[in-house]
Curated annotation (Swiss-Prot):
Its main location: secreted. Keywords: Amidation, Cleavage on pair of basic residues, Disulfide bond, Glycoprotein, Hormone, Secreted, Signal, Vasoactive, Vasoconstrictor. The lineage of its organism: Eukaryota, Metazoa, Chordata, Craniata, Vertebrata. InterPro entries: Neurhyp_horm, Neurhyp_horm_dom_sf, Neurohypophysial_hormone_CS. The modification Glycine amide is found at G32. Residues 1-23 form the signal peptide. The record marks G32 as: Important for agonist activity on V1aR/AVPR1A. This is Vasopressin-neurophysin 2-copeptin. Glycans are attached at N135. Pfam families: Hormone_4 (PF00220), Hormone_5 (PF00184). Neurophysin 2 specifically binds vasopressin. Vasopressin has a direct antidiuretic action on the kidney, it also causes vasoconstriction of the peripheral vessels. Acts by binding to vasopressin receptors (V1bR/AVPR1B, V1aR/AVPR1A, and V2R/AVPR2). GO terms for molecular function: neurohypophyseal hormone activity; neuropeptide hormone activity; protein kinase activity; V1A vasopressin receptor binding; V1B vasopressin receptor binding; V2 vasopressin receptor binding. SUPFAM superfamilies: Neurophysin II. Interacts with vasopressin receptors V1bR/AVPR1B (Ki=85 pM), V1aR/AVPR1A (Ki=0.6 nM) and V2R/AVPR2 (Ki=4.9 nM). Interacts with oxytocin receptor (OXTR) (Ki=110 nM).
């Protein structure tokens, strides 16, 4: 009887130890474990949004250069698929804010939220003009400044009501 209890206890301890040591504590564990990400090339995140023109920035964030960002809307639904892919991805052009990347003109997004970021204004309107297949309305002068100001105002009020789906 004592030998059977000892055997059961030893087996339970071994299985517990095995479970603790083999765990990977972030959702998309790459091949080779969590420290192997430095050796891997980052792929572009999944396309999303109208016509697949955007890129996923998080499980509920889809941003496109010409369209802005969709947070928690139908356009961002495809981004939930990123959670099930085995390799990490990266969207955006340059780093900004605290752990984010420039997602659209004047907008910096991390995998959880987006904020207005002045350093992300540069380059986006030039990029959209350079694209021959672009069918978006181009903004210059006062219209552009008004749109950017509205984005900034929306970013400052973001913390007030973060549960509602929004489009930037």
């Amino acid at each position: 009887m004592l030998a059977m209890m000892l055997n059961t206890t030893l087996s339970a301890c071994f299985l517990s130890l095995l479970a603790l040591t083999s765990a990977c504590y972030f959702q998309n564990c790459p091949r080779g474990g969590k420290r192997a990400t430095s050796d891997m090339e980052l792929r572009q995140c999944l396309p999303c949004g109208p016509g697949g023109k955007g890129r996923c920035f998080g499980p509920s964030i889809c941003c496109a250069d010409e369209l802005g960002c969709f947070l928690g809307t139908a356009e961002a639904l495809r981004c939930q698929e990123e959670n099930y892919l085995p390799s990490p991805c990266q969207s955006g052009q340059k780093p900004c804010g605290s752990g984010g990347r420039c997602a659209a003109a004047g907008i910096c997004c991390s995998d959880e939220s987006c904020v207005a970021e002045p350093e992300c204004r540069e380059g986006f309107f030039r990029l959209t003009r350079a694209r021959e297949q672009s069918n978006a309305t181009q903004l210059d002068g006062p219209a552009r400044e008004l749109l950017l100001r509205l984005v900034q105002l929306a970013g400052t009020q973001e913390s007030v009501d973060s549960a509602k789906p929004r489009v930037y």
